[in-house]
From Swiss-Prot:
The protein, known as: Coproporphyrin III ferrochelatase
Pathway membership, UniProt: Porphyrin-containing compound metabolism; protoheme biosynthesis
Key word Cytoplasm present: yes
Source lineage: Bacteria, Bacillati, Bacillota, Bacilli, Bacillales
Gene assigned in the entry: cpfC
GO cellular component: cytoplasm
GO biological process: heme biosynthetic process
Organism expressing this protein natively: Staphylococcus saprophyticus subsp. saprophyticus (strain ATCC 15305 / DSM 20229 / NCIMB 8711 / NCTC 7292 / S-41)
InterPro entries reported for this sequence: Ferrochelatase, Ferrochelatase_AS, Ferrochelatase_C, Ferrochelatase_N
Length: 307
């Protein structure tokens, strides 16, 4: 007999329409409304990438692809999909409540972020678990999947494809910039958080498995809190690498993200490219994982480790 269990896929969330932006930004800021200038700055960024982020649709497609792949991988279990978002509806708590209403008493949770931090993946899991405890739902949490061979294979293939478009004699003048979303430095250090080390391990694995010669690690998209965040920022790193090594090609792999959204389309494709153009060097950014079977397969393999 097939058993039905829940699959809770959690993600950051993004505004569905322009009128959602203020409430969304306020939620990110823990209930503190943005100033008019701050709100306009965010609206301008969205306009620059085409109006709104494609994240909402991509999250749904990724979640559906994962559900389908899991239902193919397991013979005796049927996974029922629920999507819970951090900063906009359907919120994480809404998804767990829907599970309860559907009679789900067991579920697997996964966040669409490959590296673990207590301030990112950990906070999603805590919110989900707190709500699940109200209803007696048992959760198995996926904490990370950056180390899964299929995840590394995806990025290795994309790096090698990008290198293939660069003349062979310029490979030694090419650098791979491996990055993830920055987080407050003090909190990371105080809690001995594994997040920076997980990015470092990812960079090492990509260096080992791909044809790239030079690799650098950076952070991006830091918040404006007035306190130090993990660095170096990828923009500062780009200038420093050029000044020291005179690299001619920069390949940006924002491996902490799993699809194209504001942080990639603006922070990489605009801000980093502006610096590359200013320096007279070539900007490259391989395709993000989205619903690629290797990426989805990496999460499936990690779920097999917990359920």
């Amino acid at each position: 007999m097939t058993k039905t269990i829940g699959l809770l896929v959690m993600a950051y969330g993004t505004p569905y329409k322009e009128s959602d932006i203020e409430a969304y930004y306020t939620d990110i800021r823990h209930g503190k409304k943005p100033t008019e200038a701050e709100l306009q700055d965010l609206k301008d960024r969205y306009q620059f990438i085409g109006g709104l982020s494609p994240l909402a649709g991509t999250t749904n497609r990724q979640a559906e692809s994962l559900r389908d792949a899991l239902n193919q991988a397991y013979d005796d279990v049927e996974f029922k999909l629920y999507i819970g978002l951090k900063h906009i509806h359907p919120f994480i708590e809404d998804a767990v409540q829907s599970m309860h209403e559907d009679g789900i008493d067991e579920a697997v949770t996964v966040v669409l972020a490959p590296h673990y931090s207590s301030f990112s993946v950990g906070s999603y899991n805590t919110r989900a678990q707190k709500e699940a405890d109200k209803y007696g739902i048992t959760f198995k949490h996926v904490e990370h999947y950056y180390q899964q061979p299929k995840f590394i294979q995806y990025w290795t293939e994309k790096i090698n494809e990008t290198l293939a478009d660069i003349p062979q004699d310029e490979h030694d003048k090419t650098v791979l910039v491996v990055s993830a979303h920055s987080l407050p430095k003090g909190l990371i250090e105080k809690n001995n958080d594994p997040y920076p080390n997980e990015l470092h391990e990812t960079a090492q694995l990509l260096e080992q498995h791909s044809n790239i010669i030079h690799v650098a690690e950076g952070w991006q998209s830091e918040g404006n809190t007035g306190t130090p965040w993990l660095g170096p920022d990828v923009q500062d790193l780009t200038r420093a690498l050029y000044n020291e090594h005179k690299y001619e090609h920069f390949i940006y792999t924002p491996v902490g993200f799993v699809c194209e959204h504001l942080e990639v389309l603006y922070d990489n494709d605009y801000e980093c490219k502006v610096i590359c153009d200013e320096l007279g060097v070539h900007y490259h950014r391989p395709k993000m994982p989205d619903t690629d079977p290797l990426f989805i397969g990496a999460i499936v393999e990690e779920i097999k480790n917990v359920y």
